[in-house]
Amino acid sequence: ALWKDILKNVGKAAGKAVLNTVTDMVNQ
């Protein structure tokens, strides 16, 4: 289903954003 793909992409994007935020915090 299309909404499942959208949900998956949103989840991936959110995971990447969280990962980037954590990495930035660690690097500071």
Swiss-Prot record:
This protein's record includes keyword Transferase: no
Keywords, in A-Z order: Amidation, Amphibian defense peptide, Antibiotic, Antimicrobial, Cytolysis, Hemolysis, Secreted
Expression tissues: Expressed by the skin glands.
Subcellular location as annotated: Secreted
One Gene Ontology term from the biological process aspect of the record: killing of cells of another organism
Modified residues annotated as Glutamine amide in this record: 28
Listed GO CC annotations: extracellular region
Remarks, miscellaneous: The primary structure of this peptide is identical to that of Insulin-releasing peptide from Phyllomedusa trinitatis (AC C0HLC4), and Dermaseptin-B4 from Phyllomedusa bicolor (AC P81486).
Family listed: Belongs to the frog skin active peptide (FSAP) family. Dermaseptin subfamily.
Main function: Antimicrobial peptide with activity against the Gram-positive bacterium S.aureus, and the Gram-negative bacteria E.coli and P.aeruginosa. Probably acts by disturbing membrane functions with its amphipathic structure. Has an activity of stimulation of insulin release, which may protect the species from being eaten by predators by causing fatal hypoglycemia. Has hemolytic activity (60% hemolysis at 128 ug/ml).
Annotated protein name in UniProt: Dermaseptin-2
Organism: Phyllomedusa tarsius (Brownbelly leaf frog)
Lineage of the organism: Eukaryota, Metazoa, Chordata, Craniata, Vertebrata
